Amino acid sequence: MIGSLKFNFILFLLISTMHMFWCHPISSSKVPGKSDYFVILLNSCPTRMDRRVGLDFLKPILEKTLMKRSFRNGVGTGMKKTSFRRAKS
């Protein structure tokens, strides 16, 4: 269980920091004569990075995990009735 928590934490950090590595081209000194690629890559990058842009593919998964549970007598409350509450009502 601890191993899966570590894996989930590392995966979360990787995904949350991924936006920092987007649109950072290799400097032109490392690639001599390839300055055109440098300019094209800079022009294709958005000027303002939004944190949610990179995480759009996770939206359906997050919505499923955050969805409230509903029950017969407590629709939308997200609370599960215990046997004591059932016997009482």
UniProtKB/Swiss-Prot annotation:
Q: Which stretches are annotated as coiled coil?
A: none
GO-annotated cellular components: extracellular region
- UniProt keyword list: Cleavage on pair of basic residues, Neuropeptide, Secreted, Signal
Localization, per the record, is: Secreted
Q: Which domain of life is it from?
A: Eukaryota
Q: Where is the secretion signal located? A: 1-23
Which Pfam family name is an example for this entry? Neuropeptide_S
List the InterPro entries hit by this protein, alphabetically: Neuropeptide_S (IPR028138)
GO BP term, pick one: positive regulation of action potential
| UniProt propeptide residues | 24-67
Q: Does the keyword Methyltransferase apply?
A: no
The protein's role, per its UniProt record: Modulates arousal and anxiety. May play an important anorexigenic role. Binds to its receptor NPSR1 with nanomolar affinity to increase intracellular calcium concentrations.
Identify this protein by name. Neuropeptide S
Q: What organism does this protein naturally occur in?
A: Bos taurus
